[in-house]
């Protein structure tokens, strides 16, 4: 209702002006020609205002709808690229046992923006604070590490650890530990934008394994794989910015 008080007020003023111009009572009480001319102008404005207001509102709704449509299309494309990235980066592995997601900051925590192979898992709605979990550590690295190291992935090659170690080393809560027990390994890559000598954090690209280990577990520490992940993360960063997804 708060969005409509201005147009309602203008329409109300127009009604009053029309009454003063067209009734005997109005002619008796408003005899000044200047005032009556002003009232005519006001009533004309009030008459066209609802149409103008409706047009503006419709234009706003259209722009909002278009923005949401472009965002949906961009997210669909990002999911397709996540699927392709799994196949390319982890060539020879079973792609159905590898998940991928992009997390962005929301209210001081990371949330999943889009993902592949994890939509029906309990950890799909997980939220991670700064420095918590593999993705939270990647967030911290993107902001605090030396510039030459900010692109380096954060790796958890074995996540089947004791509750105490997961609390102490990865700063996970008991709830987070419970919903990620099925995860076997995680690799998280910072996504950031270079701005001169500074970086702007955009999000985190993560891959993880479920159901069965990788055929080649040593590949997670391969420098070439890390570079490939960083290149993919950089591309996703450009997509986040070009499609205005973070705003």
Feature roles, as predicted:
Residues 1-12:
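Juxtamembrane interface helix immediately N-terminal to a transmembrane segment
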